[in-house]
Amino acid sequence: MNTKIITIAAIFIFSVQAKTQNKNGTFSVTDGIKCTTTLSQKNNVKILTKGDSRMSTSNAIPNHKVGAFPNPGNPNTLSEQKKKYSIPLNPKKASKLTSVSADGFGKGFPAYEFGVALNGVKLEPTAAEFFGGRGQNMNPEWTLEALSTAVNLGDDCNNAHVQPTGEYHYHGTPWEFIKNVSKTSMSQVGWAADGFPIYYKYGYKDPTDSNSEIISLTSSYQLKKGTRPGNGKTAPDGIYDGTYVRDFEFVKGLGNLDIANGRFGITPEFPKGTYYYVITDDFPSLPRYFVGTPSKDFAVGGGILGNGGRRMARNKFGNNGVRSERNDRRQPPSVQKIIKMMDTNKDGKISSKEAKGPIQQDFAKIDADEDGFITETELRKAAPKDQKRRSRRQ
């Protein structure tokens, strides 16, 4: 009898775990370090309209408590910034979606910050962290999920941390910022880079009826079933558990929201209706697509070959993911490394089919002799100065 009881209990526990994992796996917005620090710097933000733009200017200092920085997962010190964003005042849906990542959902370096919160702190869902770390085994086709418990970026309780520049930014639900949000009304919390508003998860059950009840809106993403296709050396293997962005898939109708984690509806600020994005507590938390055209002010810097100097994460893959420089100002890969990563047929140059991300986007500009291939010489001429110097040293 005891054996039967134990067996039944085990089946029950497995069933509960399977249901939980099926939605989020290792993804979590409640795993950050405690926020006990009150900053000496004061929040300073102004949001004004000018012509056909909405201007957000701030010092990027949050108006709430934060975690301790530096910390074991994030060695950077939070400091004031000079941030200025021009946001479309009258946004329109584009003919196609734009991913926040350079090569599509969960692939490549970050291409755009998603938006800015009303307190002037930027919203940036993705991180430049990949399978294989930053060495020659780096595989940018598999971006590590910043909010996975398998990836330690030193996030605080607001799912935020600090970049090497000192800029504090959110990767997911900013708990301290939204702690006073009402559960019985819609609350706008920011603006997306394409100009559409961002709300926290509470919305009307009927998106076109402001008299309908307020409910918790949910995303339409879930974990994929089965195992990843990689061999564990050049690409990840193992079950889809939320460690990578591509461990998730969009299932239309699974939740209330579309693939961009938004929907069209009435809001208190837009009584005639608007498309709006939603920050959810389940994946993806911050949206990963734009339905409109994002402002260039939100493009992630670093030039044609750059990545904005993001910090290496410590993750469960050991040295593959450990930051390579003590000061954490990680450099983009050299020209030679880029050629090696993209040159799949090993002919020493990159074809238009082999090119990825910003190089693919600017292929015609880099291909100076217009022969349909990018050589090391052509790529070096297009690279930022610091990359040229490092390429010659290697």
Identify the role of each PLM range.
Residues 21-154, 158:
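Solvent-exposed N-terminal domain segments of exported/luminal and surface proteins
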Residues 5-14:
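Sec-dependent N-terminal signal peptides
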Residues 338-339, 349-361, 376-387:
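Amphipathic regulatory helices of Ca2+-sensor modules
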Residues 19-21, 394:
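Boundary of Sec targeting at the N-terminus
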Residues 194-196, 201, 205-303:
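Extended, compositionally biased non-globular segments
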Residues 73, 153-160, 258-265, 348-349:
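Short, recurring structural edge motifs at helix starts
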Residues 117-121, 164-178, 270-284:
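Extracellular/lumenal glycan-associated surfaces
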Residues 343-347, 367-371:
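Acidic carboxylate motifs that coordinate Ca2+ or other divalent cations, activating on Asp/Glu
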